[in-house]
Regions:
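A conserved ligand/cofactor-binding region detector
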Residues: 1-753
C-alpha cells in the first residue's frame, strides 16, 4: 500500500478532500503505527531518566524524519494540493518543559532511541506547562498554555499506581508517549497524571487554589513558589513523579524476572537535577515493603541510581524544610533520617549532612551520598563542582565525580529546523553526519572555497528572510534582513545577563545619536520567559520592551538599531530563530552557567558566539579556536575570587565610568519614563547600582568592545566571517547528544548488559 493509500485508509477520504486537522490526525496515527513496529524487547539493564520537565517540542516533523517518512509525506501531500508546513501548524506544542533542563532531557531521549539503547523517560503530564506569555503595556502577563486534546501523542493507559500524599491516597495514571530514534528503536516517555485534575479552577491568569491537591497537582510546571502553599505543592508534584515512577520501574523489572535484590542488573535510574531526588528514599521504602532490609536496600539503590548536577547556583540546589516533608511525605522521613545518620558515619563535616542544623533536607546531598555517580554537564562546571561548590563531597567520594558535557540532537536542531543548510551540507560532504556528527569535520576542506562559502551565506540569508516573514506574521514586527541578527534566547535570569545586553543597546542608542554609527545595522532579538514571581527578571523584560518602543519612535536610531522581543518563546520559536542567527549571545557571568545548549544549537547552524568563558562556551572555544569565537569578560577564577573577597560595589563602577553611568541612568530618563512604567524601571535602575549580584558592570566595557569587533568583522571582512561560520558548523560534532549519551552509557549506565 502506498503512502497516499495508507493515509486515505486512515481518513476514509481522498487527501485532497481532507482538512489540515484531519490530515494531522491521520499522520499522527500513521506515526504511531510505524513507531510500534520499532519497539524492541529489553534485555539486560534499562535506563529510566527521571526529570521534572521534557521540553519535547512539536513531534510530527521530528517523528517523520526519524522514521524516514518526511520526504514521502511531503510529496504525497503536495500531490493532493496540501502543504506539510500547514499541517504542522495544526499541532499544539506540548507544554511539558521550560528551559535547557527540559530540552536536554528531550534531546537525550532522541539519542537513546537513535543509538538503539533501551531508555525511557519518567515525568509528569502537565496540563498547562509553565505558562503562555503575552505582553500587555510592556509587561509580561501569564495565562495557561493548553495543549492536551482528545487526540494527543501521549496515549492514556489502564496502568495506575497508588500514591500517598499527606496521609491521603491518590491514583497516578500512566500516559505513554512514543519516542522514535533516527533509524533506531522506539522508546517511551512515561508521563503521570491524576484523573481528578480540574482545569476550570484556574482563574485570573494562572491563579488557582494551591491547596486543592486532587484538582491542581499537574496543572502547571514549577508552580509559583512565592508562598508556602506553592512550595509545598512542588513537594507534592515531585513525590507523585517519583513514587509512581518507582512503582513503574519495579513492576517492569519484576516482569522481566528481577527479584529486587538484583535491581541494579535490570535498571539504571538517572536523577536529572534535584527534582526527582525523593526517588532514593521512595525506592528504599518500596524495597522494604518487598522484604528487603534497609542496609541492603540502600546498597541496591546506590548501585541503581546516578545523579546529574545542573547548577552552580545555590538557590537551585533544593533544600526543603523538614516540616514540609513531615506533612506531605511522612512515610519518607524515617528513611531520610536513617540516610542522614548513615551519611554522618562517613564524615564529620556538618556541611555534608542531609538534614542540617536548621532542619532543612538537602536533596543534592542525599543524591551524592546515595548514588554511584555524580556528573557535571561541562568541563568547567565539573571542575567548579569538584574544587569549589561540592569540594567536600569530592574529597569524600572522588570516584563518583565525572563530567558529561551536554549535547543536542542534530535531527531536530539541523535536519528539521534548517533543511536549507542540511541540503547544502549533504551536497558537499554526504549524509553521514545525520547519524555520525563527527562527519561534519569534512566541511573544513571547503574553508577556502568561495563557492561553498557563498552557498552558506545564501542559506543564512534565506533563513533570515524566513524568520522575518514569521516575525511579521506572528509578532507583527518588520525587520531588516540586511542587518546583523543578534539573538539572545534563553530563560530570563540575572545570571544569564540579559541586562548586560540591555545596557549595550542603550549605549548604542547614545552612540548613534552622537553620530558614531555602527559598522552594520543590528537587529537584537530576545526570547525569554521570566518566572511569575521573579520581579527583577520581569523588570528586565519591561525595560527591553520599553527600549524597543523608544528606538522604534526615533527615525535617527531605528535605521541602525532595532530591538525585538519574541512573545511566548518556545521550541517552535527557537526553530525559527536559530537558523537565522548571525551572532549568538552567550553572556552569562563566568562560573554561573553549568553548560548551556543554546550555544551549541546556534553554532551548529552557522552563528558565531559572543560569550564569556563559561559553561560549554569554554569547550566551543577549544573546538573552533579563539579566532572563530568572540570571547570577553572576567574568567571564572576572577569571578569566584571577587565573590570570596566580597568587595564588589557596583556604585563605584557607576561613579567611575561615564558610559556605565549614562546607560544606567537612561533607564529612569525622560525617554524611558515616557514609554514605560516608573516603578519597574526605577527598581531595575536601583538594583544595578546597589546590588548587581551577577557583576554586569565589570564586564560592560569588554562586552561593548568585543561586540563592536564582531559587527565590524561582519561588515568589513565578509569572507573571513563566512569562513568562521563554516568552522563553527564543522566543529559542532562534539556537541551531539549522541556523543553525550554514548559516554553516559560507557561510564555510568551500561545499558543492555
Amino acid at each position: 500500500m502506498s503512502f497516499t493509500e495508507t493515509l486515505q485508509s486512515i481518513t476514509g477520504k481522498l487527501l485532497a478532500d481532507c482538512t489540515d486537522q484531519e490530515l494531522y490526525l491521520a499522520l499522527l496515527e500513521l506515526v504511531r503505527q510505524k513507531s510500534a513496529d520499532r519497539v524492541q524487547p529489553v534485555t539486560g539493564r534499562k535506563l529510566y531518566y527521571i526529570s521534572a520537565e521534557f521540553l519535547i517540542g512539536k513531534l510530527l516533523s521530528n517523528n517523520l524524519i526519524n522514521l524516514g517518512l518526511y520526504d514521502e509525506a511531503r510529496s504525497a501531500l503536495a500531490a493532493a494540493g496540501k502543504r506539510l508546513s500547514d499541517i504542522e501548524e495544526v499541532e499544539p506544542e506540548p507544554s511539558l518543559g521550560n528551559g535547557g533542563l527540559g530540552r536536554l532531557a528531550a534531546c537525550f531521549l532522541d539519542s537513546l532511541a537513535t543509538l538503539g539503547l533501551p531508555g525511557d523517560g519518567v515525568g509528569l503530564r502537565y496540563h498547562f506547562g509553565l505558562f503562555h506569555q503575552s505582553f500587555e503595556d510592556g509587561v509580561q502577563n501569564e495565562k495557561p498554555d493548553p495543549w492536551l486534546t482528545a487526540h494527543s501523542w501521549a496515549e492514556k493507559t489502564d496502568i495506575t499506581y497508588p500514591v500517598q500524599l499527606a496521609g491521603k491516597q491518590y491514583t497516578a495514571r500512566l500516559y505513554k508517549l512514543a519516542v522514535t530514534g533516527y533509524e533506531g528503536r522506539t522508546n517511551t516517555l512515561n508521563l503521570f497524571d491524576l484523573d481528578t485534575i480540574d482545569e476550570s479552577i484556574v482563574h485570573d491568569g494562572i491563579a488557582f487554589d494551591k491547596t486543592a491537591i486532587d484538582k491542581n497537582l499537574t496543572l502547571f510546571l514549577y508552580p509559583d513558589d512565592s508562598d508556602e502553599a506553592g512550595r509545598r505543592l512542588r513537594v507534592y508534584q515531585q513525590y507523585l513523579m517519583v513514587s509512581a515512577g518507582a512503582q513503574l520501574i519495579l513492576a517492569e523489572c519484576a516482569a522481566r524476572g528481577c527479584n529486587y535484590h538484583d535491581l541494579a542488573d535490570y535498571a539504571a535510574i538517572q536523577i536529572n537535577d534535584t527534582h526527582p531526588s525523593m526517588v532514593i528514599p521512595e525506592l528504599i521504602r518500596l524495597l522494604g515493603e518487598r522484604g528487603i532490609k534497609f542496609e541492603e536496600a540502600v546498597e541496591i539503590v546506590t548501585k541503581t541510581c546516578a545523579y546529574t548536577n545542573h547548577t552552580i547556583l545555590a538557590e537551585a540546589l533544593e533544600k526543603w524544610p523538614r516540616a514540609y516533608l513531615d506533612a506531605v511525605v511522612p512515610q519518607l522521613m524515617p528513611i531520610i533520617e536513617k540516610l542522614d545518620a548513615l551519611a554522618r558515619t562517613r564524615t564529620e563535616d556538618e556541611s555534608l549532612a542531609i538534614i542540617d542544623k536548621d532542619d532543612r533536607v538537602h536533596m543534592a546531598h542525599m543524591d551524592i551520598h546515595f548514588t554511584h555517580s555524580t556528573n557535571g554537564v561541562a568541563a568547567l562546571h565539573t571542575e567548579i563542582l569538584k574544587n569549589s561548590e561540592l569540594h567536600g563531597f569530592y574529597e569524600l567520594y572522588p570516584e563518583k565525580f565525572n563530567n558529561k558535557t551536554n549535547g543536542i540532537t542534530f535531527r531536530r536542531w539541523l535536519l528539521e529546523c534548517d533543511p536549507r543548510l542540511t541540503a547544502t551540507l549533504e551536497k558537499h560532504i554526504g549524509s553521514g553526519f545525520r547519524k555520525d556528527a563527527a562527519e561534519l569535520e569534512k566541511l573544513l576542506a571547503f574553508a577556502d572555497d568561495e563557492t561553498v562559502l557563498n552557498e552558506l551565506t545564501a542559506v543564512k540569508k534565506a533563513n533570515k528572510e524566513a524568520l522575518a516573514d514569521w516575525l511579521l506574521h506572528t509578532q507583527k514586527v518588520q525587520v531588516n534582513t540586511d542587518a546583523v541578527f543578534d539573538i539572545q534566547s534563553k530563560r530570563l535570569h540575572e545570571y544569564k545577563r540579559q541586562q548586560l545586553n540591555l545596557l549595550y543597546l542603550i549605549h548604542q542608542y547614545y552612540e548613534i545619536k552622537a553620530g558614531h554609527l555602527p559598522a552594520a545595522p543590528l537587529v537584537s532579538i530576545f526570547g525569554a520567559k521570566a518566572a511569575p514571581a521573579y520581579t527583577i527578571a520581569k523588570d528586565i523584560i519591561h525595560a527591553l520592551l520599553t527600549l524597543s518602543r523608544v528606538i522604534a519612535a526615533d527615525p535617527e536610531v531605528s535605521k541602525w538599531l532595532q530591538v525585538v522581543f519574541v512573545e511566548n518563546y518556545n521550541v517552535t520559536a527557537a526553530e525559527k530563530l536559530i537558523p537565522a542567527c548571525d551572532l549568538s549571545e552567550q553572556i552569562s557571568l563566568a562560573s554561573k552557567e553549568a553548560s548551556g545548549t543554546g550555544n551549541m544549537k546556534f553554532m551548529l547552524n552557522g552563528a558565531l558566539t559572543l560569550g564569556t568563558m563559561d559553561g560549554a562556551n569554554v569547550e566551543i572555544s577549544q573546538q573552533v579556536g579563539e579566532e572563530n569565537i568572540y570571547i570577553f569578560g572576567q574568567t571564572s577564577d576572577q569571578v569566584i575570587h571577587r565573590y570570596a573577597v566580597g568587595d564588589y560595589d557596583p556604585a563605584q563602577w557607576v561613579e567611575g565610568d561615564a558610559n556605565i553611568r549614562r546607560a544606567i541612568n537612561f533607564l529612569t530618563g525622560p525617554e524611558m519614563l515616557a514609554a514605560g512604567h516608573a516603578e519597574n524601571l526605577t527598581r531595575l535602575h536601583d538594583e544595578l547600582i546597589h546590588k548587581d549580584w551577577f557583576q554586569t558592570l565589570p564586564d560592560f566595557n569588554a562586552y561593548v568592545v568585543r561586540k563592536g569587533q564582531a559587527l565590524s568583522d561582519y561588515a568589513c571582512a565578509p569572507l573571513d566571517w563566512r569562513r568562521k561560520c563554516l568552522v563553527n558548523i564543522a566543529k559542532a560534532g562534539m556537541f551531539s547528544s549522541d556523543r553525550t549519551i554514548a559516554e553516559y552509557d560507557r561510564d555510568i549506565w551500561h545499558l543492555g548488559k
